[in-house]
């Protein structure tokens, strides 16, 4: 709800000003449209101030400022970008579901996305724990497998506990 970008009605068009961070796929040659979220109703209740609108990527006033890295990985040109919008005019028919519905739309998408990413990360953590257990049985130090040296049981047990807590939260 803390958005400073604006979407203002001007006749038969909306005028967009602001920036969009983490615009996925903006460098891909097939990227032709963007979904922009900005404040359209500043005097409305907090969760009804924003709207979302479809913006043709080739609209005058859109500038790709830079590509963004994720955890140090550069996914350019197909990854995420930082875009600037200056007086971008879009037909009013491009508004999605009507003015003031942007937050609602965003929440409808973010909820399932969060669940997806949690499941994916828990799966990766399970695999990492499996590899840790195998290594503790196969890697020898001081003539014994690491698992028999005692100090590794609590590490493995704590990993299992953390994983189960993540699964339940």
Residue ranges and their predicted role:
Residues 5-8:
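A structural signal for short hydrophobic beta-strand segments in well-ordered beta-sheet cores
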Residues 63-165:
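Glycine-rich beta->alpha junctions and the first turn(s) of the following alpha-helix
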Residues 169:
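A contiguous, well-structured pocket-lining segment that forms one wall/lid of small-molecule binding clefts
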Residues 1-3, 32, 60, 81, ...:
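Short beta-strand or tight-loop elements
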Residues 12-13, 17-65:
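A short core secondary-structure module
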